[in-house]
From Swiss-Prot:
Annotated function: F(1)F(0) ATP synthase produces ATP from ADP in the presence of a proton or sodium gradient. F-type ATPases consist of two structural domains, F(1) containing the extramembraneous catalytic core and F(0) containing the membrane proton channel, linked together by a central stalk and a peripheral stalk. During catalysis, ATP synthesis in the catalytic domain of F(1) is coupled via a rotary mechanism of the central stalk subunits to proton translocation. This protein is part of the stalk that links CF(0) to CF(1). It either transmits conformational changes from CF(0) to CF(1) or is implicated in proton conduction.
Similarity comment: Belongs to the ATPase delta chain family.
Organism expressing this protein natively: Mycoplasmoides gallisepticum (strain R(low / passage 15 / clone 2)) (Mycoplasma gallisepticum)
Keywords: ATP synthesis, Cell membrane, CF(1), Hydrogen ion transport, Ion transport, Membrane, Transport
Protein name, entry field: ATP synthase subunit delta
Length: 181
């Protein structure tokens, strides 16, 4: 593994502990990871040789300032200044793994179409604890666009048992089938 990736991830883990904001940093970095994963334009801008560091900093401020802690925004700027933004997904993944290993805990996002009751949450915690053989910390969110069902996501896992997810899968399968025939 690139020593820069490890170095940035270790520095971020240390900073998260120093500020006693491990879970907040984890959640913030999940937002960053999801955005850069889905938005190739942002990655292209941050890796551009045409834009100055200040211009890239301004873009980071516009995109993230209202959604992330200042420490994470500043961290992204340091990564840009060191011309390592093309590694940001790897840095964040390494951060996730280091935190999960240290805490012997898997952080999981659970998105459901409707708010889960306490019994449903307890059942989910028990099942996920057994599946991962580890402690789990769950962030619950609701998203009515799922129509019904649930989406479970951790660092390396996505289980989409929502109607929306099944419809998207069906749409993909139909497109693939129509291209083959």
């Amino acid at each position: 593994m690139d020593t820069n990736i490890m170095g940035f991830a270790r520095a971020l883990v240390d900073l998260a502990h120093e500020e006693d904001k491990v879970h907040l940093f984890y959640d913030n970095l999940k937002v960053v990871f999801d955005l850069v994963k889905e938005n190739q334009d942002l990655m292209s801008l941050m890796n551009s040789q045409v834009l100055s560091k200040n211009q890239k900093h301004e873009i980071i401020d516009v995109v993230f300032k209202d959604h992330l802690t200042q420490t994470i925004v500043d961290f992204l700027k340091v990564v840009i200044d060191n011309r390592e933004f093309f590694h940001i997904k790897s840095i964040i993944k390494k951060f996730f793994r280091m935190i999960e290993e240290e805490e012997h805990t898997i952080f999981i996002n659970v998105v459901s179409a409707h708010e889960l009751n306490d019994d449903q949450k307890a059942q989910l915690v028990e099942k996920l604890h057994k599946k991962f053989a580890s402690q789990v910390k769950i962030l619950y969110q609701t998203d009515p666009s799922l129509i019904a069902g649930i989406r479970i996501q951790s660092n390396d896992l996505l289980i989409d048992n929502s109607i929306d997810g099944k419809l998207k899968l069906l749409k993909h399968q139909l497109r693939t089938f129509s291209k083959e025939n």
